[in-house]
Design a protein with these regions (language model features):
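Conserved catalytic core of the tyrosine transesterase superfamily
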Residues: 1-301
Length: 301
């Protein structure tokens, strides 16, 4: 491992980035250096702009993919090399067609069907935790038995995205299921341990296993929508909004740094839109039946 790569790795770990993000960032910088055949610290703004254009026009990568590469290069130059000027030299690309899609949201009935279709008690507890807390996939896989506080009725997320921790209210229905699951599985460290290792109790469930629980339950429940761990997170947030929870509270529960990120759930909430009072309703108009009779009377003359 080169000294530069080691420095970047240490900086990413110090800031508590997820293993998946660390791998992606290191790979992005490696590919950038390989493209020019030089050490990345020898490259400058001209190469950065040229590389971004290459990714968009020649490689024809989606804007979202290029944004991820830009984030990695920004981190390398600004955080690792401490070259602050690169913050302005490397802007994120704009999508002229705004291809951002709103996330998939399940109805309450679909969530119930999904949970009831779980293959075993562990998967049921996992699905209920994902939906009942709005945790990210990584957060739920790293959840420890000690993070569940039945006395305070809270679940502590210590390893949130970006390093922040937060408390999430523990639903009585979820607590009941987790207790039943614990008596069956008796997990020691991680609440959802890996089942692929002899010492599985000391290792968290893999990302693949979390995904599998969601997709298999969706298949058995005959839900046509694409269901992922994040689908349950989006659904939970949307249902909270529809139930009257304010955006600021949802922001805290989800662990969002920016309220604008949380605000997209306004676009997903049909009840929120339906609750908007139309000024037409406040007009003192004649009844439609009375008006209809008047119209017919005029046409009959």
């Amino acid at each position: 491992m080169t000294n530069l790569r080691k420095r970047m790795l240490e900086e990413l770990q110090r800031r508590n980035y997820s293993p998946a993000t660390i791998r992606g960032y290191l790979l992005a910088v490696e590919q950038f250096a390989k493209h020019f055949g030089k050490s990345p610290d020898k490259l400058g703004p001209d190469e950065l702009r040229s590389y971004q254009a290459y990714l968009l026009t020649e490689r024809k990568l989606a804007v979202g993919s290029v944004v991820g590469r830009v984030a990695a290069l920004r981190f390398f130059f600004v955080r690792t090399l401490k070259r602050r000027e690169f913050w302005e030299e490397l802007p994120y690309p704009k999508d002229p067609k705004d291809r951002r899609r709103l996330p998939t949201v399940l109805s309450l009935d679909e969530v119930a069907r999904l949970i009831d279709a779980a293959g075993n008690l562990m998967q049921r507890a996992l699905l209920m935790t994902l939906y009942g807390t709005g945790m990210r996939r990584m957060e739920v896989s790293l959840l420890k038995v000690s993070d569940v506080d039945s006395r305070r009725m809270m679940i502590r997320v210590e390893r949130g995205k970006g390093g922040g921790g937060r408390d999430i209210p523990l639903s009585p229905a979820l607590l009941e299921t987790l207790r039943e699951y614990w008596h069956w599985k008796k997990p020691r460290t991680y609440l959802f341990p890996s089942s692929l290792h002899k010492r599985g109790a000391d290792r968290p469930m893999s990302d693949k296993a979390v995904w599998y629980a969601c997709t298999e339950a969706a298949r058995h429940a005959r839900i046509k929508k694409r269901v992922t761990p994040h689908t349950l997170r989006h659904s939970w947030a949307t249902h909270l909004l529809e139930a009257g929870t304010d955006l600021r509270t949802i922001q805290v529960l989800l662990g969002h740094v920016d309220l604008e990120t949380t605000a997209r759930y306004l676009h997903l909430s049909q009840r929120h839109l339906q609750a908007v009072s139309n000024p037409l309703e406040h007009l003192q108009l004649s009844s439609v039946s009375q008006v209809s009779r008047e119209y017919h009377r005029k046409t009959d003359r």
